[in-house]
């Protein structure tokens, strides 16, 4: 993991999208092949998933990877602010 505050930190809205769809962490984890603990770590930003896992999360949540994850140095969806 990169140091706190690094401009290249990956941030996400996995929890926001998951809750909007009424899914539990366990349900999402089962769908994408992860444990509930792994989903918690991703949602809290303690773990950045692989490209394959990010794609599976996006598919399971019916959205795109760039709507779920972006670099903190840019704005939402990676756009510079």
Give the label of every model feature segment.
Residues 52-67:
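DNA major-groove recognition helix of helix-turn-helix/homeodomain DNA-binding modules
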Residues 2, 69-81:
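Short, charged recognition helix plus adjacent turn
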Residues 34-47:
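Recognition helix of helix-turn-helix/homeodomain-like DNA-binding domains
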Residues 27, 38, 67:
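Residues in the helix-turn-helix
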Residues 12-31:
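Short basic helix-loop element that most often maps to the first helix and adjoining turn
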Residues 8, 19-20, 48:
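Short amphipathic helical patch at the helix-1/turn junction of helix-turn-helix
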């Amino acid at each position: 993991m990169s140091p706190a505050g690094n401009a290249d930190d990956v941030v996400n809205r996995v929890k926001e999208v998951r809750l909007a769809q009424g899914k539990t962490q366990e349900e999402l984890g089962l769908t994408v092949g992860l444990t509930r603990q792994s989903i918690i770590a991703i949602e809290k930003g303690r773990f950045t998933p692989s490209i394959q896992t990010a794609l599976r999360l996006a598919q399971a949540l019916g959205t795109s990877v760039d709507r779920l994850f972006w670099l903190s140095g840019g704005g939402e969806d990676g756009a510079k602010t």
